Amino acid sequence: MESPIRFADVDINTILKTLPHRFPFLLIDRVKNIREDHSGIGVKNVTFNEPAFQGHFPERPVFPGVLMIEGMAQTAGVIGIMSVTGTEKPRAVYFLTIDKCKFRKPVLPGDTIEYHMKSIGRRKTMWWFHGDAIVDGQTVAEADVGAMLTD
């Protein structure tokens, strides 16, 4: 049984109040279904206008896997901050670890990535999450990420 939803929809304005990231490195558009078990889903709409496509790759644009991992981490940051504070109170989030990372399918312009993140551990200000990046119901990447929240 899924845990109750705490925040149904976190829009871009709330994300901007929560995370320090800005263009071109803000890699989520919204976060939905933040649950009491510290899980949630980040959403990234991939367009041809992404700065990374200028060099990755001009003739056949593929969204870089490392940016998907960063999108997972940003989603986890929003979930962690809002779970701790109950609001979008801004906090610095530092990436600590990436484990068990796998890239399974390319992500192309026009795709919508959903970052399904679930907390797998917490110690004081450090959090660990498992994430699956999903496009059209198929897993395109997965990883375990760790981060630290600071004031």
Curated annotation (Swiss-Prot):
PANTHER family: 3-HYDROXYACYL-[ACYL-CARRIER-PROTEIN] DEHYDRATASE. Gene3D superfamilies: Hotdog Thioesterase (3.10.129.10). GO terms for molecular function: (3R)-hydroxyacyl-[acyl-carrier-protein] dehydratase activity. This is 3-hydroxyacyl-[acyl-carrier-protein] dehydratase FabZ. The keyword Ribosomal protein does not apply. GO terms for cellular component: cytoplasm; membrane. GO terms for biological process: fatty acid biosynthetic process; lipid A biosynthetic process. Keywords: Cytoplasm, Lipid A biosynthesis, Lipid biosynthesis, Lipid metabolism, Lyase. The active site is at residue 56. It comes from the Bacteria. Its EC number is 4.2.1.59. Involved in unsaturated fatty acids biosynthesis. Catalyzes the dehydration of short chain beta-hydroxyacyl-ACPs and long chain saturated and unsaturated beta-hydroxyacyl-ACPs. Its main location: cytoplasm. It catalyses: a (3R)-hydroxyacyl-[ACP] = a (2E)-enoyl-[ACP] + H2O. It is an enzyme of class 4 (lyase). It comes from Rhodopseudomonas palustris (strain HaA2). Belongs to the thioester dehydratase family. FabZ subfamily.
